[in-house]
Amino acid sequence: MKKIISKTIWIVSLLAGLGLIITSYAGWLNPNTWSWLSLAGYAFPLFLLLTMVCLVICALIRKRYLLVPFFALIAAYPAVSLYFPLHFAALGDPVTSDSTLTVISYNTYNWSWGEGVKDKNEKPNRVVEFLAALDVDVMCLQESPLTGYSTNELNRQVTKKLQYIDTIHGHGASTLTLISRFPIVRKQFIDYDTKGNISGAFWLNVRGREVIILSNHLQTMGFTMGEREDFSSMVHGEKESRNEIKNTSHTIAGKILSASKIRANQAEALAAFIRDHKNEPLIVCGDFNDIPQSYTYHTISSALDDEADALTDCYRAVAAGPGFTYSRYGIRARIDHMFCSSHLEPIHCRVDRTTDASDHYPIICQMIFR
């Protein structure tokens, strides 16, 4: 019996460790080439948990197997620190001064109309109320169409202290809105393959220095409300039929792969824009609709890796915890991100979970010029 237990611990530890390493580096794989294998990164949290459990079990029962999960964690450390950074000093209050630049990226979900607001003219609007209470310099808002009502609400509560506002409209219904304390010099629509999503750049004059804000709302998964509810039921163990679980899993995975292929092309277009402006202060932010262990994230974050100065993931650099920006229907993930070029240094970053007005939580980061 002891031999069976010992062998089982060895096999499970080995498989968990291999799975952790594979899922850690799945973001290098283009879904247009590697198809299903490129989605392995979505299983990273599961293999991380399994490896941690194996580490504890080996430490308590079979110390001679301890090296297996230990070395797996070492090999996967870059992905582990990306998924769960541990900068606990960042949990304190941010330092504010005239030399800092504080930016929020927030998918407002059409000013939360999709979150059960029956009256689009509901007052007060919870998204606008949340924004009005913030002390930030720049607001990068996705899914934020400026209707007469939303414009009036912003004018009444927000633009009194952040007086510059502009928008970029995509081929579909999606809108990027930027509200700034600093003058908006110009803007540029980023043209790429999309089904109703959008990216755009805004040039700001920040205390005499020109800074580019590249705001993004990348390809959505395209789940219907019914599919989201089916997935939630499956995650919470409410689906008992094997066929139901199989059908739901197949539908969800198929849509993730389809959207990932589109986002891969979008990410490559954004990486080209980033390289074209590598000598300018640049902030890249928005709703990427993808996780840190994805090709989308890897392509954008590594756009300048061949250069002397790479992009910095602000959350990874100074924050703590997994920082989930989406938590609905059994899905918990960090899919909203913010990067800065080497001209800027992040000093504080957090995901604000005090508001549930939208289906996303905003990410707020503070930087200083180097």
Describe the predicted segments one by one.
Residues 6-20, 25-57, 67-68, 188-190, ...:
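Metal-dependent phosphoester-hydrolase catalytic domains
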Residues 61-72:
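Membrane-interfacial entry segments at the cytosolic side of transmembrane helices
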Residues 73-98, 125-132, 138-234:
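Structured beta-strand-rich core segments of catalytic domains in phosphoester-bond hydrolases
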Residues 105-124, 222-259:
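Acidic/histidine-rich helix-loop elements
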Residues 110-113, 146-149, 171-175, 196, ...:
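Active-site environment of divalent metal-dependent phosphoester hydrolases
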Residues 118-121, 153-156, 228-229, 297-301:
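Short, glycine/charged-enriched secondary-structure capping and boundary segments
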